[in-house]
UniProtKB/Swiss-Prot annotation:
PROSITE patterns: AA_TRNA_LIGASE_II. Keywords: Aminoacyl-tRNA synthetase, ATP-binding, Cytoplasm, Ligase, Nucleotide-binding, Protein biosynthesis. It catalyses: tRNA(Pro) + L-proline + ATP = L-prolyl-tRNA(Pro) + AMP + diphosphate. One of its GO terms (molecular function) is proline-tRNA ligase activity. One of its GO terms (biological process) is prolyl-tRNA aminoacylation. Consists of three domains: the N-terminal catalytic domain, the editing domain and the C-terminal anticodon-binding domain. The lineage of its organism: Bacteria, Bacillati, Chloroflexota, Dehalococcoidia, Dehalococcoidales. InterPro entries: aa-tRNA-synt_IIb (IPR002314), aa-tRNA-synth_II (IPR006195), aa-tRNA-synth_II/BPL/LPL (IPR045864), Anticodon-bd (IPR004154), Anticodon-bd_dom_sf (IPR036621), Pro-tRNA-ligase_IIa (IPR002316), Pro-tRNA-synth_IIa_bac-type (IPR004500), Pro-tRNA-Synthase_IIa_type1 (IPR023717). Catalyzes the attachment of proline to tRNA(Pro) in a two-step reaction: proline is first activated by ATP to form Pro-AMP and then transferred to the acceptor end of tRNA(Pro). As ProRS can inadvertently accommodate and process non-cognate amino acids such as alanine and cysteine, to avoid such errors it has two additional distinct editing activities against alanine. One activity is designated as 'pretransfer' editing and involves the tRNA(Pro)-independent hydrolysis of activated Ala-AMP. This is Proline--tRNA ligase. It comes from Dehalococcoides mccartyi (strain ATCC BAA-2266 / KCTC 15142 / 195) (Dehalococcoides ethenogenes (strain 195)).
Length: 569
């Protein structure tokens, strides 16, 4: 491909609304173009990379015994009502009506459609197992699209669904897909981690996320370096600090003027944060909820939402807290009425805590769970953090940032029961089909690759998913020797099947080198009068600072060797 014919242009300035590195570089390199919030066009360079990612995915899916199909994006809302997932997805669903006033949605995922198909075409144990997948555009009305391709409203996704006759069959399908996903990321040249995850609105009994490790990632990964336990911070469990038990003392009100935060109160009263309690207020499906936790811990809102089994959970607004008769900054679980109280199990681990007095400028000393307040629900609702104790060994948690690029779930019979997707066994007895679902974000994977592979100059594409394998930079192309050598090398490389982007533009060396670094093509071949006078051309790997002079007669062999060494992942 000649650069002079390439559709799209690079930008020097960093777009003001681009927060993540991948968003900045995708826009600056002219690889994507925004149409509206969370909706992008893939320009030719990015689309070449997308196609390569999809090809790797297809190869691994097909190798794992999967069959590709295509399902409709337009779905009747009734199937979402039948599954019971219309409410959990809530405003994320794009709703529309057709000309006959029928309610439809744009598919954010396809569990409902595939289960409906299974109910029609799987009748016997002889029809099992089945593994079906598609690569298709999906739609989710994200409240805050951000991060370029990281969180969008229209996106490309590979979704696969497994159907088995037994839990053991599901386990086999699940492990097969887990390995296939790891193969995809490895072949794309990316470092990934498999971690325990929350199932969210998809549902199911177990799930794992696949994270591409990147400092700018939006997800927090909690892991134990000693035993290799790893989980999303939303899901992670940990060993909470044990406090000594003391005999309960009498409640005592103390003045704490202007001391509203846990750290302020602890310092003022010469306590440690773990000797305090804090109350956080939420609205859960419109119902007022107080969550109580030890002062050294934070609320995990995903755990809380799962415990309450609510579709919508948000922090209560100041007006809602005030209407409940609560003094903000001095809130107390003691004596509070007309609210659902949820306590983290840490409140049982300790005694004589300090908590708010629900009175401006005052706190209560010697607050004890059971005597002074009770909970309607008690569970682990604490957020794991770096430095927490691992519950599976004597290690201590560390943390990394990552971008989620895949999520797999053991659905079980959750959906098959609702859709009547049953099979008869060898004895003629009917059973619900046991399902799994497996999602992989293709656009997210593209963005994550950049988050993991870049420097201050631009993108550094892994060879397997680079738009082109080599960038030919012709300098002083008005020089006949340079233009002839460049054209000859370009033609011969293409004839060998090498993917070449030939910068044939009449621009300065500085502009061409800057664009080469920004676009991140893995190899750069520079043809200039000075190099030709030395009997060769300059070859440089984008990932390295050093370059080498390659004799003209050795170019083909050297380039192909470099491509192969960078592709064998």
């Amino acid at each position: 491909m000649r650069y002079s014919r390439l559709f799209g242009k690079t930008q020097r300035e960093i777009p003001s609304d681009a927060e993540t590195i991948s968003h900045q570089l995708l826009l600056r390199s002219g690889m994507i173009a925004q149409l509206t919030a969370g909706v992008y066009s893939f320009m030719p360079l990015a689309w070449r990379s997308i196609q390569k990612i999809e090809n790797i995915i297809r190869q691994e899916m097909n190798k794992s015994g999967c069959q590709e199909l295509a399902m409709p994006v337009l779905q009747p809302v009734e199937i979402w009502q039948q599954s019971g997932r219309e409410a959990p997805f809530g405003q994320t669903l794009f709703h529309l009506k057709d000309r006959k006033d029928r309610n439809l949605v744009l598919g954010p995922t396809h569990e409902e459609v595939i289960t409906d198909l299974a109910s029609r075409y799987i009748q016997s144990y002889r029809d099992l197992p089945q593994r079906l997948y598609q690569i298709q555009t999906k739609f989710r009305d994200e409240p805050r699209p951000r991060g370029g391709l990281i969180r969008v409203r229209e996106f490309i996704m590979k979704d696969m669904y497994s159907f088995d006759a037994s839990p053991e069959g599901l386990d086999e399908s699940y492990q097969t897909m887990k390995q296939a996903y790891e193969n995809v990321y490895r072949r794309c040249g990316l470092e990934s981690m498999v971690i325990d995850a929350d199932s969210g609105a998809i549902g199911g009994k177990a799930s794992h996320e696949f994270m591409i490790v990147a400092e700018s990632g939006e997800d927090s990964i909690i892991y134990c370096p000693k035993c290799n336990y790893a989980a999303n911070a939303e899901k992670a469990v940990f060993k909470k600090k044990t406090l000594p038990k003391e005999p309960p003392k009498d409640l005592e009100e103390v003045a704490t003027p202007g001391q509203k935060t846990i750290s302020e109160v602890a310092a003022f009263l010469s306590l440690k944060p773990e000797n305090t309690l804090k109350a956080v207020f939420y609205m859960a499906d419109g119902k007022f909820v107080m969550a109580v936790i030890r002062g050294d811990l934070d609320i995990n809102e995903i755990k809380l939402k799962n415990l309450l089994k609510c579709n919508d959970l948000r922090l209560a607004e100041d007006s809602e807290v005030k209407a409940a008769g609560i003094a903000a900054g001095f809130a107390s679980p003691v004596g509070l009425k007309n609210s659902l109280t949820v306590a983290d199990d840490s409140v049982e681990n300790g005694s004589n805590f300090v908590a708010g007095a629900n009175k401006d400028g005052f706190h209560l000393k010697n607050v004890n769970f059971g005597r002074d307040f009770k909970a309607d629900k008690m569970a682990d609702i604490a957020l794991a953090a770096e430095g927490a104790a691992c519950p599976f060994c004597d290690g201590t948690f560390a943390s990394k940032r990552g971008v989620e690029v895949g999520h797999i779930f053991k659905l079980g019979t959750f959906l098959s029961e609702r859709f009547g997707a049953n099979f008869t066994d060898a004895e003629g007895i009917s059973h619900p089909i046991i399902m799994g679902c497996y999602g992989m974000g293709v656009g997210r994977l593209l963005a994550a690759a950049i988050e993991q592979n870049h420097d201050e100059k631009g993108i550094i594409w892994p060879m397997p998913i680079a738009p082109y394998q080599i960038y030919i930079c012709g300098l002083f192309l008005d020089n006949p020797a340079v233009s002839q050598a460049a054209e000859k090398i370009y033609t011969e490389l293409e004839a060998q099947g090498v993917e070449v982007l030939f910068d044939d533009r009449e621009l300065t060396a500085g502009v061409k080198f800057n664009d080469a670094d920004l676009l991140g093509i893995p190899l750069r071949l520079t043809i200039s009068p000075r190099n030709l006078d030395k009997g060769g051309v300059e070859l440089k790997l984008r990932r390295n600072k050093e370059s080498e002079l390659v004799p003209l007669e050795s170019i083909m062999e050297r380039v192909i060797t470099c491509i192969k060494s960078q592709s064998d992942l």
